[in-house]
Regions:
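GIY-YIG nuclease catalytic motif and its immediate N-terminal context
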Residues: 1-44, 48-75, 79-80, 85, ...
Length: 97
């Protein structure tokens, strides 16, 4: 086995702020790549219509299932609670791109 095969995939739940001030929530294995996709017109239909987007929140989770569950939890929050979540959890240097 190669050294690379021992590297565990990281999963993240993320939130971006769209140009219309709305939040879009999703999950990914690479938040910076995913934001670039959203801004390059290769993301979700919503972000293509309301871009550009800015990464405002990233949370690492255990696995794919956890990412989906956390995404659903965040999507149920209202706008003010999403804004508070982003404000209370500043991006680490790794994701300031």
């Amino acid at each position: 086995m190669t050294e690379e095969s021992h590297v565990k995939t990281r999963f993240y739940c993320y939130m971006v702020r769209c140009a219309n001030d709305a939040f879009y929530t999703g999950w990914t294995t690479d938040p910076l790549r995913r934001v670039a996709e959203h801004n390059g017109g290769r993301g979700a239909r919503y972000t293509r219509m309301h871009g550009p987007v800015k990464l405002v929140y990233v949370e690492q989770v255990e696995d794919h299932v956890s990412a989906l569950k956390r995404e659903a939890q965040i999507k149920r929050l209202g706008h003010a609670r999403k804004a508070a979540l982003a404000e209370a959890n500043p991006l680490s240097e790794e994701f300031k791109g």
